[in-house]
């Protein structure tokens, strides 16, 4: 793998590599990447999906490489601006605190002032308790406020200091979302060289590349949320607290206009909710016709934006001017996205409304390209550059990475597959349960699930991930099993109840009798080596919900082009997801354990063999 990466860099070519768990793929791409960066004065950008892998690269792999190579090189973990405190904005917020904040928020501001004097890097991760989001929004770095001109000479401006290190770095570690957010060159706007992606002289390596398609679709699309628009406007003026920037400026007319616009926002999104036929099972509704609801927001948003522009012109205070300009841009961007959504601007996009929240429901207008391949082909796989994609799970079984390469626009890019060195015949056993109802018989299936989960938990004495495809099913099974598992002295951890994903994994590792119930985010990117995880239970084959608007649009496009939506999309996507879930179990050469599939379709359906053939070769027992 290292040789293939070195050759791709040498020849300014692209590469897709599937490297099985245990290959040591991070070092295999880091060694040639670092050497190439140093010898050719280039910048290596390594993008991952998870924080875990970023931390592994920065704290373990790259320091090890520094010792082995006996070469000095600069590494920066690149975080988004919103993670950094801006001292200039903090001082402005303190000076205007009476007009901006309520009493509890002012107490929070004081806590941040004390922390700002002692923090080493000024980022959210350095705070022991996450700050109030409203307060943090007033003091974090913002692109048009915290600039090189306003903050560049301040040694305590954490973002500007980080930016200097970023530009000087040999290796930049970041995440996929931030990468695509900055793909227009805004990472280093002073560097206009067209020879790279973010910095002019860079090349990029995407690890955990199986997530690139989904993340790119989000970043290339649009989203206007009721919550986000409300938060932005309330920074201008919040009628409930009677605080905000217009209150500081004593602009009575602007205060009234903002309060009225906030009412229009709530009314508009209420109409969106009424127009959409949501249910407990259906939280996303596809929009197929323009003017889904009447556009009653553009006019008040435009009027509010005009007020902000006028106040900017009248303002002498550069800091306040920057704050107004930033909020004015947010209003403008929301207005443009709203207009694009209501017009259904692009035939290549799918549009939908999403409902979130269980008690206080809010709505988001979404749009995303049905197919990201044409976009990524031109953005990433251009001539004279090097983009390397790698992951442990890119293939769907004997097809030379063709499916993945087609999905991301890398059809012409060479592919390389390297198998895992692990001895799965010895380390892993697969159980497939035939004596269980079809998952589509939900009532009988859920009752049987609890019985079979308990059976296999006894076999491994807990120490298990139980992976679900439905949050609702997970909650129902957890409620049914909680007391019984407690009696058996297993500690049940359930995603979404109280702890974050990171906290759940950390807690899981502490006790050998833990059982963790998880959905989407636990199928991949979670690493628990050793005895703590000895059992992975797959409750259902992970087919994507076919009526999710984006999935539905992709299936319809395949059908319209004469293809078979099931074999061309639904099945390969589910196979990849299953491979990722099963891949949680064996992380080192000494790991041992069992994988359980509680879905009889893997035996009863013709496509079942495709799932089994895509898994590592190991002993299989049907029960």
Language model segments and positions:
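Conserved pre-motif I regulatory segment
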Residues: 1-18, 28
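Signature of the SF2 helicase/ATPase Hel1-core->accessory helical subdomain module
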Residues: 29, 35, 55, 60-63, ...
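A substrate-engagement module of RecA-like helicase motors
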Residues: 38-172, 177-180, 236, 241-251, ...
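Conserved RecA-like ASCE P-loop NTPase motor core of nucleic-acid helicases/translocases
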Residues: 43-52, 389-390, 462-469, 473, ...
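A contiguous, basic/glycine-rich beta-loop/short-helix subdomain that forms a polymer-engagement track
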Residues: 136-172, 180-194, 310-436, 445-451, ...
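Conserved RecA-like P-loop NTPase helicase motor core
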Residues: 433-444, 496-602
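Conserved helicase motor "Helicase C" RecA-like lobe of SF1/SF2 P-loop NTPases
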Residues: 469-496
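N-terminal targeting/trafficking signals and adjacent low-complexity tails
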Residues: 596-623
